[in-house]
Amino acid sequence: MPPKKRMKNGSSLKSTSKKGEKSRNIITIQDLFSKREAQLTDTPNKLLTDHDQSASDYAYALKLQQLFDSENQATAPEKLPKDVIIPEEEYHTDTFNVVKESNDKPKENLVTSEECKASFFSTDSVNKDSTIDYDALQKDPLTYVKSCRARFVSKDTKSFSYSSLANTFSLISSTKSRIRIVTLLTNFLLTLLYADPDSLIATVWLCTNSIAPNFYGKNLGVGPAMYSKALKEVCGITASALKNLWNKYGDPGDVAFEAKVSVRTLSRPEPLTIKKVYSTLLKIADSNGNGAQNRKLELTKFLLISSNAEEVRYIGRSIMQNLRIGAVQNTMLASLSKAFFIFDNQNEIFNFNSDSLQQQFRQGEEIVKQSFFQVPDYNILVATLLREGIENLKDNMSIRPGIPVKPMLGSITKNLQHMLERLTDHNFSCEFKYDGQRAQIHCDRLGNIKIFSRHLEEITGRFPDVIEVAQLALKHSCDFIIEGELVAIDKSNGQILDFQKLSTRERKKVTVADITIDVCVFVFDIMFCDGKSCLQMPLIERRRMFFEHFNLIPNRFQFVSSLETNEEQSIQEFFSLAITNKCEGLMVKVLNGTNSKFPSTYEPDKRGEGWIKVKQDYDDEFESLDLVPIGAWYGNGRKAGWFSPILLAVYNPDTGAYEAVCKCMSGFSDQFYKELTQKYSLESGNSSLKPIYNFCETGKVTPQIYFAPQEVWEIKGAQITSSPAYKAALGLIQDDRGLSIRFPRFIRVRSDKGPEDASTNSILADMYMKQLNT
């Protein structure tokens, strides 16, 4: 891909007028957005309803607006030119303060109930600067970009209103086609690249139902009770009426929309911008200390008051972290790569033939994904794309201490014999697969150590003993990233303890004196060492690198037990030894070689043939799966008053959907049933009588209560079967039938995994095909 000069932010497009002709009028963003001009007729002023709070609510919103504006004027940083490269030392600083907000005066217009109830295009037409041609937005990006580059100038434009994004969300929510979702996202991102690139980062986070990477530790902390209180105060709705809305709709956005639909205010709030919504969510997350709960409540009310029509629906979902429009990680990365490739190559792109263009799109997407998996932070990704473009992305985004790497994953196999058949003619190592918590240990050049979980959350405060032992084991000062399993252990005899022992350790602010359960770090890889990435080294060289820089400390800091042989009997004995030592089985890894199907390099976020799991099976045929509870029925007889059975699902990473796979009612204790029923009671806010998520695919199975996907359970069964009732892996094996699990049994809660770390639909399909070929 030849390098292209990037268009500098703020530069206008060259005039297309010929010499001697009058310059053509440049069509501004306002002209582009005029296609769907407001069709609302003026509505006579109406009296306020008996909700007397509305006037004071608006005054309160204005007060908060003025407060935000004064804060922004005092703290807004000077904008950096695009050719400035951020020093590596500054990557760990808070990048959120780059978000700027409009200081425009609010307009004084009466909002009537008719306007509140109007369709979203009509309501959105009030904000003319952000009324996008939504018909064009749904067209092929190459068709869309022709109008974009001819009409936009990228200077002197206003920040996009949130309504433009909410309207796009509505279009995305109307389809489950990944191609159409990518098209809509690509075109909206292209619009921002031309007209408002400063809103790109905020847009990406809002689209992905997040406000920051997991390792930033930023959580909104707005629970169902606070959200309901905000709705009651903003909308003047009673608790019983609000409960009825929850029972009827189950979705926080739909509840907010219906609760606010008849609310009238004296004046129309200032239109929310994309950056304003995002920065307010950050303020909610950053509210700590005395008065934090009240501050969060006030900010939540501000967003609800300031939003109208479709805006309130999606703001409500964002506040409750329940957006679910299908813009999952892979979809967003594909959309970003396509938008930037088109923008960077806008003068040449129409010269590509179709096959060449698709190849360029695929290459660009692969570059963006590889870069993001090494540095999984949209703040850095988008900023680097804006500055460098796709062609220079890999050189400017590589693994570094302090930012966790997306972990490499192991593929599944039926048994040792099958593994040996797959790895014929390859040198490999068999390692104990310990039953602990997978973790990355990072050390920067100053000796500061951080620890991250497998789903990229920082857990440093939970393991002060690991920090201590990592410092002791290091032979000489250098920066590094190592990966291993944190395993509960009896240090007196080296005996490995059950994983449940480790889960009892406190999660925050643990001191060495507080520790009652000791851990041993069983290292199995090194990804960065002494200023250099080790990802492209074969495993055998990465091991050598580890032993050159670290000493082993018995029962505290060890390398995984491993065996290098192709002899089946020796491997079988080693497997038995692993089970005797309370391990889950073996992880078999290719040591060297350049075969792309069996890589010996470290491949972030990939489940390749270079790592193969061999686990002890429940019935010697069925490997366990990590499933997500998404619903339940009310129990009968002895289980009356509890939830039983429980509906479980696999995860589809392409759509973000949780696909129902089976009902489980075996393996639970009475105490577990009691705790589960309390956790997912209707009063908890973790469940609903209606589907909470649009992307929970239950097929022909209808539970009596729906759970918010939030935890992972390890499940074993007897067999995978084809099913017309369940949606799991639908289309991967048969177009009209999904897959289900016979005789599922609960094993344990996987507290080290989040819902998106659950077993995927493709894993289930692979297991089914292996079962058929047995």
Curated annotation (Swiss-Prot):
The keyword Nucleotide-binding applies. It catalyses: ATP + (deoxyribonucleotide)n-3'-hydroxyl + 5'-phospho-(deoxyribonucleotide)m = (deoxyribonucleotide)n+m + AMP + diphosphate. NCBIfam families: dnl1. One of its GO terms (cellular component) is nucleus. The active site is at K433. The keyword ATP-binding applies. Gene3D superfamilies: 3.30.1490.70, DNA ligase, ATP-dependent, N-terminal domain, DNA ligase/mRNA capping enzyme, Nucleic acid-binding proteins. Keywords: ATP-binding, DNA replication, Ligase, Nucleotide-binding, Nucleus. It is found in: Nucleus. This is DNA ligase 3. GO terms for biological process: DNA biosynthetic process; DNA recombination; DNA repair; lagging strand elongation. Belongs to the ATP-dependent DNA ligase family. Its main location: nucleus. GO terms for molecular function: ATP binding; DNA binding; DNA ligase (ATP) activity. It is an enzyme of class 6 (ligase). Residues 1-25 are annotated as: Disordered. Pfam families: DNA_ligase_A_C (PF04679), DNA_ligase_A_M (PF01068), DNA_ligase_A_N (PF04675). Its EC number is 6.5.1.1.
